Amino acid sequence: MMKVLIAGGGTGGHLFPGIALAEEVVTRHHRNEVVFVGTERGIESRVVPKEGYPLELVKVQGLKGKGFLSLLKALFALPLAFIESFRILARQKPDVVVGVGGYASGPVVMAAWLMGIPTAIQEQNALPGFTNKVLGRIVRVVFIAFEEARAFFPEKKVQLIGNPIRRKLMDNYLRSHVAHERFSVLVFGGSLGARGINQRMTEALDSLGDLKDSLHFVHQTGKNDLESVRKGYADKGFQAEVVEFIDDMSSAYARADLVVCRAGATTLAELTVCKKASILIPFPHATDDHQAVNARALVDAGAALMFRESELTGEKLAQTVRELKSHPERLKSMEKKAGLLGRPEAAKELADVCVDLMVQTWGPNGRERTPIEAEKKAPRSNS
């Protein structure tokens, strides 16, 4: 029996690798448990309970990129966050604590380290975030997804495993065999959409009119641009499924011949595992421009093309879609190279190390817990 506490979140890019780890842990043994720690404002407050896992909350804010007053407020909140973290850890008694980035991971992982609980962090991006850079000095293991991140951490702690992918997405993708006659383009910009991508894609339609009978689009717009984008496709006579949010990404990937999207770490992990050619448009306001650094790894491998949003026009995007559609051999090459970067076993490798950390510290049966605690059954994911 093993109990893993996963700390962090805030965005899907941080949280979903943690969900993937949780799925791997609870499927290994019916008595394994996973508990998450996050913030009320983060995406975890909605997603984690829906997935069937317990969630503890701490009140903590980021320190980087704030004005003076906001920084003071965040600093004053830190002691309380540490106290909350110690209480949660004492109550939950995890065998291992894994930080996945985001505000909550800092105080929780640091408190676990001070309590002698084995710790690890998982860095999703090629350019590590502030919290993980700090935590990398004290944790036992640092899991990275890009070779470029290695230089930011103590070499002996680093393990390159890739970004864990949710079991549901992988299993459904492998079962999906969607036949389609038209060249299918999947367009999305994250769960909230991306106005820059939405605008450039609808502008690109003006230069793709002669291909409208051979193209099909699946476009996730987010809430704000849904109606305007839907109208753009309809007015120009293109076949398109325009939705606010795609619930079944595995089927969307299975149907796609080409993907136009941002360059978040989780998205890139999905592209490589699903072996998809892509046009990447990094989020221009990402911290330290980390999405562009992420994208560069795929571009250098020949698996993707990248355009800066500020330099990309609708006409240029249309030209790129046209060229890739006209050269299927190039698309196949990009797909093959994307697949070579994929790491479908990342969650398994991460869970294996968690087991090793538990055994090294507590023995094969983990920490001693009261009979009532020991009989608790791990909440199961709905995935």
Curated annotation (Swiss-Prot):
* GO CC terms of this entry: plasma membrane
Gene3D superfamilies listed in its UniProt record: Glycogen Phosphorylase B
User: Which pathway does this polypeptide act in?
Assistant: Cell wall biogenesis; peptidoglycan biosynthesis
Membrane-protein topology:
Peripheral membrane protein
Where mainly located? Answer: membrane
Q: Return the Pfam families for the record.
A: Glyco_tran_28_C, Glyco_transf_28
Q: Which domain of life is it from?
A: Bacteria
Question: Which InterPro entries does the entry link to?
Answer: GlcNAc_MurG, Glyco_trans_28_C, GlycoTrans_28_N
Q: Which GO molecular function annotations are given, in alphabetical order? A: UDP-N-acetyl-D-glucosamine:N-acetylmuramoyl-L-alanyl-D-glutamyl-meso-2,6-diaminopimelyl-D-alanyl-D-alanine-diphosphoundecaprenol 4-beta-N-acetylglucosaminlytransferase activity; undecaprenyldiphospho-muramoylpentapeptide beta-N-acetylglucosaminyltransferase activity
Any one GO biological process: peptidoglycan biosynthetic process
Give the family per the record. Answer: Belongs to the glycosyltransferase 28 family. MurG subfamily.
Q: What does this protein do?
A: Cell wall formation. Catalyzes the transfer of a GlcNAc subunit on undecaprenyl-pyrophosphoryl-MurNAc-pentapeptide (lipid intermediate I) to form undecaprenyl-pyrophosphoryl-MurNAc-(pentapeptide)GlcNAc (lipid intermediate II).
Write down what this protein is called.
UDP-N-acetylglucosamine--N-acetylmuramyl-(pentapeptide) pyrophosphoryl-undecaprenol N-acetylglucosamine transferase
Q: Which organism is it from?
A: Myxococcus xanthus (strain DK1622)
Gene designation: murG
